[in-house]
C-alpha cells in the first residue's frame, strides 16, 4: 500500500472502529442484559466441564470441538456465559474491521474521505448481513467467531507473498493466528483452510491506477518536446 493510501487509512481507522462497535452493539443489544445465551444451538452456562464429548472422544461425533473444551477451561476463571458474550461481540467487530481492511487493501483510498467511505460500507456489510443474522437466530456463536477470522485470513493470505521481508513475517504470523481462531469449530477450520489456499494462490495486489497514471504522465512529459 502506498504512503498516501496508508495515511488515508490511518485517518479513517478510528472512525471505522467506532462504527463497528456501534452496529455490533445495535445487533447484540439483548446480550447486554442479565442472563445467558439460550437460543437453539447456543446454550451458555456459568460453568462447564471437560467431558469426553467436549474432547471429541465420546460415543457420537462432536461438532463442537474445541469450543466446548475452551469454554470449559475459561469457565473456571470467569463466568462462561459472559465469556460467550464477549467472544461473540469481538467476533463481529473483527469481521467488520477485516472487511474494511480488504477494501482498503484492494481499492487504494487516495484521501481520508475515500478511506472512510470504503471502510464504513465494507464494515457495515461485514457485520450486518443475512448470514450473521441467521447464525445469531440459530445460536451459532462459535461459527460467527470463525466468520470474524475469515476476512483476516483472506487479507493476510494475499500479503504472505509480499516482497518485503518484515511484511511477509508479519503476514505469516497474522495468518497463523487467524487460522487458529477459525479452527474454533470443524466447519470454521475447513473454511479457514480453503480461504488460506485461495488467498495465497491469488495474484499480487492490483496496481494503484492513480499512481500508474501519475507515473505515465511523468514519463511521457519529456517525449512531448520531441513531437
Predicted regions and their residues:
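Membrane-embedded helix bundles of polyisoprenyl
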Residues: 20, 96-106, 115-206, 227
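Membrane-interface coil-to-helix junctions
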Residues: 21-99, 124-147
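Juxtamembrane loop-transmembrane helix junctions in multi-pass integral membrane proteins
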Residues: 8, 78-85, 110-113, 183
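Start-transfer (signal-anchor) and selected internal transmembrane alpha helices
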Residues: 1-29, 217, 221-226
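Transmembrane helix-loop junctions in multipass membrane proteins, especially transporters and channels
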Residues: 32-36, 40, 163, 204-208
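Short, basic, low-complexity termini and linkers enriched in Ser/Thr/Gly/Pro
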Residues: 204-221
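Alpha-helical transmembrane segments of integral membrane proteins
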Residues: 11, 15-18, 85-92, 117-120
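Membrane-interface segments at the starts/ends of alpha-helical transmembrane spans
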Residues: 76, 176-178, 220-222
Amino acid at each position: 500500500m502506498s504512503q498516501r493510501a496508508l495515511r488515508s487509512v490511518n485517518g479513517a481507522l478510528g472512525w471505522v472502529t467506532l462504527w463497528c462497535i456501534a452496529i455490533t452493539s445495535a445487533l447484540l443489544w439483548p446480550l447486554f442484559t442479565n442472563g445467558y445465551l439460550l437460543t437453539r444451538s447456543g446454550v451458555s452456562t456459568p460453568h462447564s466441564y471437560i467431558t469426553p464429548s467436549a474432547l471429541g472422544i465420546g460415543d457420537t461425533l462432536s461438532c463442537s470441538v474445541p469450543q466446548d473444551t475452551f469454554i470449559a477451561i475459561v469457565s473456571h476463571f470467569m463466568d462462561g456465559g459472559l465469556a460467550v458474550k464477549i467472544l461473540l461481540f469481538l467476533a463481529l467487530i473483527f469481521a467488520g474491521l477485516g472487511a474494511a481492511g480488504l477494501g482498503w487493501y484492494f481499492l487504494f483510498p487516495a484521501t481520508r474521505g475515500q478511506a472512510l467511505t470504503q471502510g464504513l460500507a465494507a464494515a457495515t456489510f461485514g457485520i450486518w448481513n443475512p448470514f450473521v443474522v441467521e447464525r445469531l437466530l440459530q445460536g451459532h456463536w462459535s461459527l460467527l467467531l470463525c466468520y470474524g477470522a475469515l476476512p483476516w485470513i483472506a487479507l493476510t493470505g494475499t500479503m504472505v507473498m509480499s516482497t518485503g521481508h518484515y511484511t511477509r513475517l508479519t503476514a505469516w504470523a497474522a495468518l497463523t493466528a487467524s487460522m487458529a481462531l477459525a479452527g474454533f469449530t470443524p466447519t470454521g477450520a475447513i473454511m479457514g483452510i480453503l480461504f488460506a489456499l485461495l488467498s495465497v494462490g491469488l495474484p499480487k495486489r492490483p496496481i494503484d491506477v492513480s499512481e500508474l497514471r501519475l507515473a505515465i504522465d511523468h514519463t511521457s512529459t519529456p517525449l512531448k518536446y520531441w513531437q
